[in-house]
Amino acid sequence: MRLALAGVREGRRNRDAAAGEDFTSIRTQLSTGLDVLEQTTGWMLRTGASDPNSVLAGSSPYLRIWGLVVGGWLLAKSALAARGLNGDTVAAAQLPLARFYAEQLLPAASGLAGAATAGSRDLFALDADALGDVVRRTARV
C-alpha cells in the first residue's frame, strides 16, 4: 500500500510541474486526500496486529477513502492528458469534471478517516439479540 501511495504522490508531483492555475483546487484536494489516506493506512498497519477487529470495523470507510482518492487521481491524470486535445468535447469536459470531483467529492475522505480509525468498541458493544431488538423496534416506527 505504501508503494501504491508513493506512486500516486510521485505522479502528482510530476503533473503539478506541468499543470497550471486551473489545477489549483485539484492539486490541493488531492494532496489532502493523499495525506488522509497515508495517515489512515498507517493506523491500519499499526493496529492490525494487535487489534484486528478494529481494522475490520474500519475497513468499509477505509476502502471508501481509497476509492475517493484514486478517483481524484485518475480524473486529474485524465484532465492533464486532455489539455492538448483542442476541439474534442470529451477532452474539454475533463478539467471541469476533475475540478468538480476534487471540490465536491474528494473532501469526504477527510470525514471518513474518523470512522475508519474509530475502533471496534461500539461495534461489539451490543450482542446479537439486543441489536436484533433495536432493529425490530426501529422498523415499526
Where do the model's predicted regions map?
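C-terminal amphipathic alpha-helical interaction region
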Residues: 7-141
